[in-house]
């Protein structure tokens, strides 16, 4: 029988890893929850078992225990359910934002993995792993209450991990691997054009307060002078005495003409490189302990940011009108503001003066992991195992998409696009797994395991709809069945229950593209940003049914 792997098989596996993104990460943060079906059956407690080539991910030193040439290829299939109940989300002005999220996770998702090992001699074994280390897939309804934060997101990765292990003697082995990791991210969200229109109108009225107040106070005289009636959006605010209230009244009235949202889509990809190392100590034939470390990988994703305002309706006065400094403005300028025939579609203005399609980039540091594991063959039938994994999620303090400026684009009032930033301040986490094997017969091995996986989200105020993570609990079952002396199949099932995740995240930006100043939403502080402002408030309830199937063969 040939020992050569067909190139088409490797190409298929690599392509599948990108074509089938995972749902919301099954491990804490955005780690995908399983890189091996045999490991899934024990809730990933088997880091020191080294039962097949998937030990490349968990502890590469385990390769030294694998005789001959071995191949394992698996598929993880997820059936998630994620429900969101809104608890009073508001836009930047404090108005309720309504809309059903539906199930924010896809109906199903899948991710394959592939591992190969080859024993070169009594001391050296080499291998290759291709797997999904990170993944996320969120898919809210377009009109849900948190749409100004995000509507959909996809994070896809594939990791190529060639490894080598050296066995010093029957007690000590080490392993080392390098990783080439490809990552691709796509996210989509809504743009609050109505909010932006209200801000720009309010800024205009505030800067031209005397003229606007005069028009509201003596509309008949203004019409007599300029030959055009004062819009009711201004005259309806005649009775509002204080300046701030008057400005807000006029701005709100004009913004009520606006219907529909704009949309943005950000896409980027990158290659990054890292390494992993492991040590395996076998004090007796039936007992072994392992320690392994997987490095962080730094990615700088570069891609495109695109905007669409085709769904925006309504007409408002253009904010790009200069009334001059006098109490009696220019006649043409007044007609631009007062005559509805001269009003513009706010979506067209947003595309032409606020949001060009542009390049962008974001930096992502995947977290390093440190694992300590143990395995003990209690008797001929029963084996016990445990694993504790620490993950440095604190590397993620924020997600920031830097948006490049477009040369020659006529940014309104010089308000260029700022970064789109999501504050996270994640904390380091740990996962504790306990598992057991039971040799039911010569051909059938049964597995089970439980795990507690801590979430990196540090508070309700820092839980964002793009990262609705929470603590989770694993209950897993698995089996390995020998079809022939050289071929076996692995099966696994896990039920993953998430704690309820309450959210009350506030976006400090505003739809007009600036951080509001001390004077309120109509004052430009000079600090640029991309966002919509508002508060996303609600609660997530999530569980996942997780199935695994793998085929193993020894040559």
Protein language model features and the residues they cover:
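N-terminal, post-signal peptide beta-strand-biased segments of exported outer-membrane/organellar beta-barrel
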Residues: 21-126, 130-132, 164, 494
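Positively charged n-region of N-terminal signal peptides that target proteins for export
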Residues: 1-7
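Outer-membrane beta-barrel porins/channels
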Residues: 26-40, 108-555
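Short N-terminal alpha-helical targeting/association segments
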Residues: 15-16, 51, 360
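Bacterial N-terminal signal peptides
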Residues: 8-21
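Low-complexity, polar-biased intrinsically disordered regions enriched in Pro/Ser/Thr/Gly
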Residues: 3, 90-98, 530-534
């Amino acid at each position: 029988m040939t020992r050569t792997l067909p190139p088409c098989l490797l190409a298929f596996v690599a392509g599948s890893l990108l074509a089938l993104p995972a749902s919301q990460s099954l491990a804490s943060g955005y780690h995908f929850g399983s890189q091996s079906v045999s490991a899934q059956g024990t809730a990933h407690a088997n880091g020191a078992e080294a039962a097949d080539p998937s030990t490349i991910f968990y502890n590469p030193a385990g390769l030294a225990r694998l005789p001959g040439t071995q191949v394992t290829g698996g598929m993880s299939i997820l059936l998630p359910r994620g429900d969101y109940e809104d608890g009073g989300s508001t836009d930047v002005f404090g108005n309720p934002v309504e809309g059903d999220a539906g199930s924010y996770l896809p109906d199903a998702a899948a991710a394959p993995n592939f591992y190969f090992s080859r024993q070169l001699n009594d001391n050296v074994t080499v291998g290759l792993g291709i797997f999904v280390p990170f993944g996320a897939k969120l898919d809210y309804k377009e009109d849900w209450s948190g749409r100004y934060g995000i509507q959909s997101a996809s994070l896809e990765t594939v990791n190529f991990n060639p490894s080598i292990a050296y066995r010093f003697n029957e007690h000590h082995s080490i392993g080392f691997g390098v990783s080439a990791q490809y990552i691709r991210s796509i996210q989509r969200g809504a743009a609050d054009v109505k909010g932006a229109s209200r801000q720009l109108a309010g800024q205009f009225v505030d800067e031209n307060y005397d003229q606007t107040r005069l028009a509201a106070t003596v509309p008949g005289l203004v019409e007599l002078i300029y030959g055009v009636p004062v819009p009711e959006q201004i005259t309806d605010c005649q009775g509002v005495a204080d300046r701030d209230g008057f400005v807000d009244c006029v701005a709100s009235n004009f913004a009520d003409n606006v219907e529909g949202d704009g949309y943005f889509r950000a896409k980027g990809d990158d290659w990054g490189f890292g390494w992993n190392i492991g040590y395996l100590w076998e004090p007796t034939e039936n007992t072994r302990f392992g320690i392994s470390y997987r490095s962080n990988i730094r990615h700088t994703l570069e891609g495109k940011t695109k905007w669409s305002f085709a769904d925006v309706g309504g007409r408002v006065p253009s904010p790009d009108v200069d009334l001059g400094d006098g109490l009696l403005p220019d006649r043409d300028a007044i007609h631009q503001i007062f005559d509805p025939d001269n009003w513009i579609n706010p979506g067209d203005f947003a595309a032409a003066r606020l949001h060009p399609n542009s390049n962008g980039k974001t930096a992502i540091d995947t977290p390093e992991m440190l694992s300590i594991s143990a395995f003990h063959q209690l008797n001929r039938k029963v084996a016990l195992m445990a694993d504790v994994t620490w993950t440095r999620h604190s590397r993620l303090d924020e997600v920031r998409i830097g948006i490049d400026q477009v040369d020659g684009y006529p940014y309104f009032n010089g308000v260029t696009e700022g970064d789109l930033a999501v504050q996270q301040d994640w904390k380091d986490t740990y996962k504790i797994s306990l598992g057991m094997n039971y040799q039911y017969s010569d051909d059938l091995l049964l597995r089970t395991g439980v795990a507690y996986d801590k979430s990196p989200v540090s508070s309700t105020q820092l839980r964002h709809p793009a990262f609705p993570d929470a603590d989770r609990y694993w209950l897993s079952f698995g089996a390995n069945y020998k079809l022939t002396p050289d071929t076996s199949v692995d099966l696994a099932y896990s039920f993953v229950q998430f704690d309820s995740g309450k959210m009350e995240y506030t976006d400090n930006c505003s739809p007009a593209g600036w951080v509001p100043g001390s004077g309120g939403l109509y004052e430009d502080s000079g600090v640029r940003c991309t966002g919509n402002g508002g508060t996303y408030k609600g609660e997530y309830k999530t569980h996942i049914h997780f199935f695994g199937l793998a085929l193993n063969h020894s040559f």
